């Protein structure tokens, strides 16, 4: 193809999926990317496919960067198009550090998720208010019940479930779900009408994934996890993948394989990854873009 005709070809929009036939039907869909906004099922919350996690080894990796280094990392992620940031009560100072890092960025330009520890003897509303203050935000887009690791969690956390619904009524929380660990807990996700979304451990090797013992050091049951992911997505739940890179133990090739597996095999909506360098952010974006190609 001559250079002239190549330019004319590109102008038609075929390369970006904009050429249409009669009736305006696209001949080719636009390419999907890591920073596209996707809806997390019936939660209705729109997030980027790639999230910014702050819980590497319970947040130690991110805390060790110090506020200045962590802020640079968050701003790099934002500049690269990541618009979904998540943390948890159990990650130490990460609510406060994330609030500082995001200060000055329009609140309606990104989504913020927190995860609450479902303790007895704690007021849910007081805890949500505390976390909002620490994160310097009026509301969380998503609040998860964190670290649900028993088969009885839907009954055990009833008070916290009601507390989240109350917070939603006050517009302190937009939507909700749970993060689950271990097959007994995961098996209670399908058919759970309270859940709008679930955070589930997914990768291709089973590293740090769900087994009968939630705390096992052995590979998890990949096939059963994927079965549950597919089922809950059919039910309309959103699914966020965690432990995608085996808690930081995977090399580059396995990180790429894990990303492909999460989206192409398991069919998750979104993945969260914890970072310590800007290069890791850039690589995660590249890996996800390749997985979607």
Label for each model-derived stretch:
Residues 2-109, 204, 261, 265:
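N-terminal binding-site loop/beta-alpha segment at the start of enzyme catalytic domains
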Residues 40, 52, 85, 98, ...:
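Conserved, mostly hydrophobic/aromatic
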Residues 42-44, 99-107, 131-137, 190-193, ...:
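Acidic (Asp/Glu)-rich catalytic clusters
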